[in-house]
Amino acid sequence: MMSPSIPPADTTDSDLMLVERTVAGDQRAFELLVIKYQRRIERLIGRMVRDVDLVEDIAQETFIRAYRALPQFRGDAQFYTWLYRIAVNTAKK
């Protein structure tokens, strides 16, 4: 999906700050969220779906849906919890 090499300073940004930056138009901020959570999301989906190619497709769709829904993210829950729910719902479809 995206390159896993990121400058160390970027990894200190909080998820909420990265969400806010993404909503404001900073594409790099969303890339950092994807890099941070891509493997966790793929492992989660992999427990639900055994086809490796399908796991990657569902993970990609999860991040697309999350990106589109970011303006509605209120921060009531942790970002990963919100992303987890999107991944599970996407995998069930």
PLM region spans:
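Intrinsic, short, N-terminal disordered tails of RNA polymerase sigma-factor systems
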Residues: M1-A24, L32-K36
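Amphipathic, Lys/Arg- and hydrophobic-enriched alpha-helical face
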Residues: V34-V52, A69
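Short, conserved catalytic or interaction motifs in soluble domains
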Residues: R50-D51, Q72-G75, V88
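Acidic/polar helix N-cap motif
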Residues: G25-D26, D51
